[in-house]
Amino acid sequence: MARYFRRRKFCRFTAEDVIEIDYKDIATLKNYITESGKIVPSRITGTRAKYQRQLARAIKRARYLSLLPYTDLHQ
C-alpha cells in the first residue's frame, strides 16, 4: 500500500518575521482571499492562529475601507 504524504504547510508570516499584518498591504491580502471573496482558512494556507486572526481583521478592515471587494461575483 503506497502512502500519500503531503508537503508540510508553513506559515509565511512566521518565516518572514512579520510583526503585524497591515490592512493597506493589498497584494498580500489578495493571496488569502478566494475568487468569490471569502477568506481562505488556515488549514489550507498553513497560517498560524495568531496570524490568521490578524489576517481576518486586516481583510475586514480593507473591505470596510473599500480597498478590497466583499465579493467579485457581481452580475
From Swiss-Prot:
Entry GO CC: cytosolic small ribosomal subunit
Pfam families: Ribosomal_S18
Gene3D superfamilies: Ribosomal protein S18
One BP annotation, GO: translation
A GO molecular function held by the record: structural constituent of ribosome
Keywords carried by this UniProt record: Ribonucleoprotein, Ribosomal protein, RNA-binding, rRNA-binding
Domain of life the protein comes from: Bacteria
Stated family: Belongs to the bacterial ribosomal protein bS18 family.
HAMAP family listed in its UniProt record: Ribosomal_bS18 (MF_00270)
Function (record text): Binds as a heterodimer with protein bS6 to the central domain of the 16S rRNA, where it helps stabilize the platform of the 30S subunit.
Protein name: Small ribosomal subunit protein bS18
